């Protein structure tokens, strides 16, 4: 088996732990990232954590639309979340037990034209035998009003994460971009 691009003759050549795995430019409702299980860059088993950075907007009508994650095709109520949000006028919080996690809100088609939301999902300890935890930060502009959103979530499964489905409320608008990064264990001083 050949070494991934960031390893040369068995030595980690990149001093940083971040590895770009894949970038999608969706114009549909969902984006799936699936582990290649081949020892190469796309093989999730080599990473400690995963990070998804999204710059996106929904094509669906409304000021705000949701963006969520599901792991390993699990559509059951095996997720938990604590959310905090604010818009400069009011703040709120909620606890949920949904069929997905990583909730954030992105600008919908009723928002100011050409304004996209930023969303960062940090998914921790993806190959451990523990329940998987994650954090989400997002912010976006809307006509009803601008909002910042944070979530701490749990996937109640001990399985290693081998697939991540990024789901939008509606469809992603043209120009949206979703990038997946793997975080390697530190192997250099």
Give names to the regions the model predicted:
Residues 2-189:
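Surface-exposed molecular-recognition determinants
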């Amino acid at each position: 088996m050949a070494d991934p691009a960031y390893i040369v003759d068995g030595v980690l050549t990149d001093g940083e732990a971040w590895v770009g795995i894949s970038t999608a430019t969706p114009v549909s409702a969902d984006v799936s990232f699936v582990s290649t299980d081949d020892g190469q860059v796309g093989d999730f088993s080599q990473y400690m954590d995963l990070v998804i950075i999204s710059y996106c907007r929904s094509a669906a009508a409304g000021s705000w639309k949701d963006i969520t994650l599901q792991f390993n095709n699990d559509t059951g109520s095996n997720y938990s979340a604590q959310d905090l949000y604010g818009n400069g006028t009011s703040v709120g919080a909620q606890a949920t037990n949904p069929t997905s996690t990583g909730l954030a809100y992105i600008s919908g088609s009723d928002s100011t034209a050409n304004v996209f939301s930023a969303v960062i999902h940090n998914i921790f300890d993806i190959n451990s035998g523990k329940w998987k935890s994650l954090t989400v930060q997002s912010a976006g502009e809307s006509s009803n009003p601008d909002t910042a959103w944070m979530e701490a979530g749990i996937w109640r499964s001990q399985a290693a994460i081998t697939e991540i489905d990024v789901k939008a409320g509606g469809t992603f608008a043209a120009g949206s971009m979703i990038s997946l990064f793997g975080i390697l264990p530190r192997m250099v001083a």
